C-alpha cells in the first residue's frame, strides 16, 4: 500500500536517484527498528544452508551492503549484496539506468559502481541481520581480463568469513570483456583457482562457504552445456541463472530500447527461464539452480521452480511492484514440490 503511494513520486525522479532514495530509506529503517526475523514459509535446505523461504533479493540493488537490515524486514528468505570489487570504482557515467515502463523493464549500464570490498565488509559487520547473506564478487574495470581471477580471489579472501555463500559474477554486460570468462578454457582456469582457494579458506576458518556462478541469458545451448560440465567438474556448489540480457528483440520500438547496457525485467523472463531449464536437464540435480530474471508475479516465481530452480531472486520486479511482490512470490512457491501442478523443465526451452 505504501509503495503504491510512493511509486508515482519515485517514477517522477531519475531512476538512479529514486534508487538511492529507496536505499537511504531502507538504511534508516534498518537502523532504528529491531532486527527482523526471516519469514518462515515452506523452508528448504540448499547448498547445506537452511532457507526460510525460496524468495531472495538479487544482487545489484544493495551493492555495498548499506541497507541489509532494512531489506531484511521485507520478507525475503535470503539476501544477496554486491557486486563488489577489490577497489572502489565509480562505474560508468550517468545517466546509466533507464526505465521502460511499457514493458516493465530496466536497462542499466552501471559498470560495477561500488565502494570496494573493505567498505562492504564493514557494513556487513555492522548489520544486525543474521539470515542467509550471499555476497556477489566481480573484477575492477581496469584489471586486465587475463588477471581477473586475482580480483575474484582477493574479494573471496575478504568476504569469506562473513558470507553464507559467495557468487562469482562473470556475466555482467557492462564490464568490458567480462563475459569472455564464460568461455571454456577461461572458465576452467577461473573455477579451478577459486575452488582451490575455497578449500584453503574452509580449512583456515573451519567453515565451508558455498560458491555459486552467475551466468548470462545470452548463451547458445552448447555454451550452457559446457558451463554445466565445468560446474560439475570443479564441484561448484550452485549456479544463478541469469543476469541481464543484451538482446533487444522484445523491446523494439520502446523508448530507451537503444540504450547500451543490460536489459532486465519482463522481457528477459522467457530467455532466462529457458537457460534454467537447460541447466536443469544438463545438471540432472547434481547442483542447485537459483533463478533470476523477469519475475513480476507469483506465477513467474513458480515457473522458475517448474523449470528446475530450487530458489528464485527478484530485483526489477520490486521496482514495478514494490515489496508486495515478495509476499506474493512466497505464497506462490509454498509447498511447490507437493502441489502436483508443477510443469517439468521440458516445458521450457525444449
Swiss-Prot record:
Bilayer disposition of the protein: Peripheral membrane protein
Keyword Flavoprotein attributed: yes
- One GO process term, biological-process aspect: 'de novo' pyrimidine nucleobase biosynthetic process
Requisite cofactors: FMN
* CDD domains with a match to the protein in the record: DHOD_2_like
What does the entry list as the binding residues for FMN? Answer: 59-63, 83, 136, 169, 214, 242, 265, 294, 315-316
Q: Which PANTHER family match?
A: DIHYDROOROTATE DEHYDROGENASE (QUINONE), MITOCHONDRIAL, DIHYDROOROTATE DEHYDROGENASE (QUINONE), MITOCHONDRIAL-RELATED
Q: In its UniProt entry, what is this protein called?
A: Dihydroorotate dehydrogenase (quinone)
Give the organism the record lists: Aromatoleum aromaticum (strain DSM 19018 / LMG 30748 / EbN1) (Azoarcus sp. (strain EbN1))
Gene for this chain: pyrD
